Swiss-Prot record:
MF (Gene Ontology): RNA binding; zinc ion binding
Purpose of the protein: Required for the translational activation of PER1 mRNA in response to circadian clock. Binds directly to the 3'-UTR of the PER1 mRNA.
Quaternary structure and interacting proteins, as annotated: Interacts with TNPO3, which may mediate nuclear import of the protein.
Presence of keyword RNA-binding: yes
Classification via PROSITE patterns: RRM (PS50102), ZF_CCHC (PS50158)
Lineage, opening ranks: Eukaryota, Metazoa, Chordata, Craniata, Vertebrata
One GO-annotated biological process of the protein: RNA splicing
Taxonomic source organism: Sus scrofa (Pig)
Keywords assigned: Activator, Metal-binding, mRNA processing, mRNA splicing, Nucleus, Repeat, RNA-binding, Zinc, Zinc-finger
Protein name: RNA-binding protein 4B
A cellular component annotation (GO) from this entry: nuclear speck
Cited Pfam families: RRM_1, zf-CCHC
Amino acid sequence: MVKLFIGNLPREATEQEIRSLFEQYGKVLECDIIKNYGFVHIEDKTAAEDAIRNLHHYKLHGVNINVEASKNKSKASTKLHVGNISPTCTNQELRAKFEEYGPVIECDIVKDYAFVHMERAEDAVEAIRGLDNTEFQGKRMHVQLSTSRLRTAPGMGDQSGCYRCGKEGHWSKECPVDRTGRVADFTEQYNEQYGAVRPPYTMGYGESMYYNDAYGALDYYKRYRVRSYEAVAAAAAASAYNYAEQTMSHLPQVQSTAVTSHLNSTSVDPYDRHLLPNSGAAATSAAMAAAAATTSSYYGRDRSPLRRAAAVLPTVGEGYGYGPESELSQASAAARNSLYDMARYEREQYVDRARYSAF
């Protein structure tokens, strides 16, 4: 079957008219008109060639029509993939097998599979129907339409249709464009068993040109990496120093000899509660110094009951004292005891009784 293209058809043309026009040269299987062009399927190839020779530029309803072989067929529709081929099979034997269904343009065997290019798409379809899942030289081969444009060997067709860049003149395995779409500066090594092999890495960790880039990828795991104790202590001290500078920078600088001597002293009492003097008032400074001297004696004494000197216990009748510094001294105890020795106020009992009995 041959498909013919008819162009520049007049509006008055009908399918029946076109069919009868081409049936003069052979059997017409199908006729379709689409707007100002159409397609005619003729069974015999010789009849199609005669129709093209006689009807091209034929005047129909005052318009010259164009008749030629249809060129809109897909290139992949004539390419067959033949799998599970016997290792003893040759190209000539496989070509002869497929020529039973039509002319074969090319036949190439690659290991246990092959690619066969038929001249016509209808012949390729007939070959699939007749040879798929059939025995050939002791093996059951599988025939189907090929959808791959990959050229795995120089002998498989012309150097056209690279599936990576779409340009002609080279096979895909020799294409300068890598799989990511960028131009590669090396020739990709082809592995027959596993396909294309990725080139090995040439740079180690940290040697990339983008490794030290300020705008590159962030290291989110830097805080979790193990660091030495000295590094951690130094980082903590630096952060504390920076925090103190930021928070104390707005406070005025106090220049005082008392404060300087206190800070420079090597023996600093942690319980000392001296108040910082004001540099603007000398009297206030003196008062603070006196208060500090008084409070230092209070905080400086030994407050442990075990190391304290034993107090003299008072005798009976002298009251209870709590040491020489207590307010309950012996004199106060004697004054308190004398109150019990005073004569009580005595009333006249009979007078009061007579007053209450009058009522």
